[in-house]
Amino acid sequence: GLTLVTSPLWAPAQIPLSGFNGVLLLSVGVALYAMHMTLYGASAGQESWYLFASVSGFDAIWRIVAICAVGLVSAHLVGLEAATVSPVLLWLLMVLLLPEARRVFGSRADVSSGRLLYNYTLSMGSSTANAVLMMGLPLLLNASIDSNDSLQQVILAVLILAISITRSPIMIPLQAFQGVAVSAFLKQQNHPLRAFAKPAGALLGVGLVGAAAAYALGPWLFGLLYPPKPSEVEAYAQVVTSPVLALLVFASAFLALLVLSGSLVIALNMHRSYVAGWVLAAVVACVVAVSPLPLLTRTLLALYTGPVLGLLVHLGAMVW
């Protein structure tokens, strides 16, 4: 309801081409996403870690498949927006089709209503920080550049596309992998850093391999999939380079580590530390993103500094 009521304040600037359809889809998506997160949180509370991983993993897979399907059929803006929002129906299908999901979804809280409200508040804080770090940076970066500078606008558009592409190879498999990681972690929770080291090493290894591949093949592959228009050639020369693409891929490994460490901290019932890590990561990334540094420099710094500091908070919580 709040999204719908406040839409006149932000919709014209943020989704000028979508109009009422975009606002309606976003409002419905926000409402249904609350149920999605209820299943996600309850699965953690019930220690149903494979369901926990499935809720997040299939969310990402569904979104990619839906967007590709719409793109092949029509690529109409409303269709693409609906495809982006459609994973909020995943919780409903899981509850209807999976007995374990029904059991978890119907479980009752094991704390008082006051404590439950407090936990909800923490969850809202961490979800907000997560959303800012995952998807809010483009808005901040866009607000921080001169709207009359067409080159900066094009550079930002190419940079956002590059960030989206370089994140996917690590973040999507992580969604399916983290349930296994949490389950293995809990078996060794008396030695949390040792338990965290193996999956963390795997993620960093994937990040290094991906960065090397991006350095060697990234510019060629990017240009093949997204050939530049004449107005984009100069922007491509700055963004679509081997060092930049390699750094973007490796940055996604640190974001993945933050996501994984957050899941492990939640598994240990350290909710405040979980929120603190995500909030610190989001705040630092936002501050760096709007700093007076050159656009490309501050974007790369924001992608590294925020997740690394948030990760350190989570690791500190595991130890102390």
Predicted regions mapped to residue ranges:
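Interfacial/gating helices of multi-pass transporter permease domains
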Residues: 77, 114-123, 141-167, 239-242
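Residue-level signature of transmembrane alpha-helical cores of multipass secondary-active transporters
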Residues: 25-26, 30, 52, 56, ...
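Interhelical loop/hinge segments that connect adjacent transmembrane helices in multipass membrane
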Residues: 50-55, 77-78, 83-84, 93-134, ...
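Helix-loop junctions and terminal segments of transmembrane helices
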Residues: 1, 162, 166-190, 267
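Hydrophobic alpha-helical transmembrane segments
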Residues: 20-27, 53-102, 280-284, 296-320
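Membrane-water interface segments that mark the loop-to-transmembrane alpha-helix transition
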Residues: 1-8, 21, 184-211
